[in-house]
Amino acid sequence: FLPIIAKLVSGLL
């Protein structure tokens, strides 16, 4: 995934 997507996912977790 893109760094932006990964950041969003990590934020949800």
UniProtKB/Swiss-Prot annotation:
Secreted in keyword set: yes
Keywords: Amidation, Chemotaxis, G-protein coupled receptor impairing toxin, Mast cell degranulation, Secreted, Toxin
GO biological process: chemotaxis
Domain of life the protein comes from: Eukaryota
Subcellular location: Secreted
Residue positions, PTM Leucine amide: 13
Gene Ontology MF terms in the entry: toxin activity
Transmembrane segments: none
Any single GO CC term annotated in Swiss-Prot or TrEMBL for this entry: extracellular region
Similarity-based family: Belongs to the MCD family. Crabrolin subfamily.
Function: Mast cell degranulating peptide. Induces the chemotaxis of neutrophils. Its mast cell degranulation activity may be related to the activation of G-protein coupled receptors in mast cells as well as interaction with other proteins located in cell endosomal membranes in the mast cells.
Name of this chain's protein: Vespid chemotactic peptide L
Naturally occurring in which organism (per UniProt): Vespula lewisii
Taxonomic placement: Eukaryota, Metazoa, Ecdysozoa, Arthropoda, Hexapoda
